[in-house]
């Protein structure tokens, strides 16, 4: 009798299941643990208090990213609390024998950029980090998700995690993406379709022609924002693109170990006939460049659209929520998206801070000038991304056009470092969240692709990137 067809998620889960209790609570083995300065201090302190060691320091990688300034790092950190967290991570990594990339190491960068970059992220592995956007690593066919600080301590101490199994959802995007439509638009469209709670209780597997056609950078963008759709994690079955990306990376397997790993990785795909608890299908050809208008990632609209009118919403709770969002964003129903002017622009983050993203922005920026009313910053996702961009001359294109070229870090994605919006400043951002205050107190965030962000910085307002050239 043939084995029951299983999903990619099921396969990885089953390969890592240590124990399952009668109530469905499971103990899962964790292959990789990424650590940063914000969610780890209490976890390490818990280990010290209990007299425990890190169970598998070689399976743990630490980097500083959330709090580091992206300007001159030879100067002291202006925020004492941030400086304390950074110093604590350095001390904890040293005391517990963990590899650590500090702010002066060219390998330093946003944790979800450096994991794949170093080959620490591998197909078929379980990966956790005290950060919600750990789902990024699912682009390589890894089961990756964020955990809380107490769970960080548990993984450090035991290399296991207590979990309950999620359900399976497959999101299939077939067809060819039109010019000007990117991975960022794909995932924003998916979130717009299912809402920020639509993926709750699920692990999403992304499939279809349009997903397979994406580069690894594009796939990371899609998986990165799975959490904004409410999902536990996002997955894409690994293929030749993933293997090519990883081969030769510093921490990837070498020689015979690579060959053995590859044989396993090639089994990592959902079987024909595998059961998914929910299915969603999208037509890639119908997707436009997208801009968010409100204070939730589900508040999406085509760049050719107009700010929606909450009065058209029948559900009272939802109507009141959208009215609040419009008031916070300072927008009037019926306003053309292309008439919305911006004050700031941010290209970077674990969503869109990779070399492909910077190339797309540079293509838009070349020979142009940033609008006099816009402050625009570009923050590479890692020191190695920065190094590559500079080798390609992208930094010169940006600087000549009037963009600020910064050091790597999380930067303006979140208001935990000096890069913040002032109250009521409006920002075109390539990050992943547009919540109230996310980029600074009373700051107004519109999520877009790198090309759309660069074009808005130059025009001073949102434009349809399809008309740019």
Swiss-Prot record:
A GO molecular function held by the record: 3-isopropylmalate dehydratase activity
Keyword terms: 4Fe-4S, Amino-acid biosynthesis, Branched-chain amino acid biosynthesis, Iron, Iron-sulfur, Leucine biosynthesis, Lyase, Metal-binding
Keyword ATP-binding: no
Pathway field: Amino-acid biosynthesis; L-leucine biosynthesis; L-leucine from 3-methyl-2-oxobutanoate: step 2/4
Group of enzyme by EC: lyase
Binding site for [4Fe-4S] cluster: 350, 410, 413
Catalytic activity: (2R,3S)-3-isopropylmalate = (2S)-2-isopropylmalate
Subunit structure: Heterodimer of LeuC and LeuD.
Protein's UniProt name: 3-isopropylmalate dehydratase large subunit
Organism per entry: Rhodopseudomonas palustris (strain TIE-1)
């Amino acid at each position: 009798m043939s084995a029951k067809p299983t999903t990619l998620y099921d396969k990885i889960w089953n390969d890592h299941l240590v124990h399952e209790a009668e109530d469905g609570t499971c103990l899962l083995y964790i292959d990789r643990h990424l650590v940063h300065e914000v969610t780890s201090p209490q976890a390490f302190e818990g280990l010290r208090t209990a007299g425990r060691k890190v169970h598998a320091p070689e399976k743990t990688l630490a980097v500083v990213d959330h709090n580091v300034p992206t300007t001159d790092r030879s100067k002291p950190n202006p925020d004492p609390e941030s400086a304390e967290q950074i110093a604590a991570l350095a001390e904890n990594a040293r005391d517990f024998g963990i590899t650590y990339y500090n702010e002066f190491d060219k390998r330093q960068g946003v944790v979800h950029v450096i994991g794949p970059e170093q080959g620490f992220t591998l197909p078929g592995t379980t990966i956790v980090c005290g950060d919600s956007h750990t789902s990024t690593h699912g682009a390589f066919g890894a089961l990756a998700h964020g955990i809380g600080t107490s769970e960080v301590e548990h993984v450090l101490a035991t290399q296991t995690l207590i979990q309950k199994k999620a359900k399976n959802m497959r999101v299939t995007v077939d067809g060819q993406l039109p010019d000007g439509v990117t991975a960022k638009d794909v995932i924003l469209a998916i979130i717009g379709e299912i809402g920020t709670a639509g993926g709750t209780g699920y692990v999403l597997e992304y499939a279809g022609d349009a997903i397979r056609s994406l580069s690894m950078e594009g796939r990371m963008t899609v998986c990165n924002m799975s959490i904004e759709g409410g999902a536990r994690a996002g997955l894409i079955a690994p293929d030749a693109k993933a293997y090519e990306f990883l081969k030769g990376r510093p921490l990837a397997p070498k020689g015979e170990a690579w060959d053995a790993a590859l044989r396993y990785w090639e089994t990592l795909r959902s079987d024909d006939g595998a059961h998914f608890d929910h299915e969603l299908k999208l037509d890639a050809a119908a997707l436009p460049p997208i801009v968010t208008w409100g204070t939730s990632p589900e508040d999406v609209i085509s760049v050719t659209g107009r700010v929606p009118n909450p009065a058209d919403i029948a559900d009272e709770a939802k109507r009141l929520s959208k009215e609040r969002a419009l008031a916070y964003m300072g927008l009037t129903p019926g306003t053309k998206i292309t008439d919305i002017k911006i004050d700031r622009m941010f290209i970077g983050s674990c969503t869109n801070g990779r070399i492909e993203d910077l190339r797309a922005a540079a293509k838009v920026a070349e020979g142009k000038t940033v609008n006099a009313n816009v402050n625009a910053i570009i923050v590479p996702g890692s020191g190695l991304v920065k190094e590559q961009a500079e080798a390609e001359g992208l930094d010169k294109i940006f600087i000549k056009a009037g963009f600020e070229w910064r050091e790597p870090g999380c930067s303006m994605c979140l208001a935990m470092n000096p890069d913040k919006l002032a109250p009521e400043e409006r920002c075109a951002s390539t990050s992943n969240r547009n919540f109230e205050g996310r980029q600074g107190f009373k700051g107004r965030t519109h999520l877009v692709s790198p090309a759309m962000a660069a074009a808005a910085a130059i025009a001073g307002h949102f434009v349809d990137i399809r008309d740019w050239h």
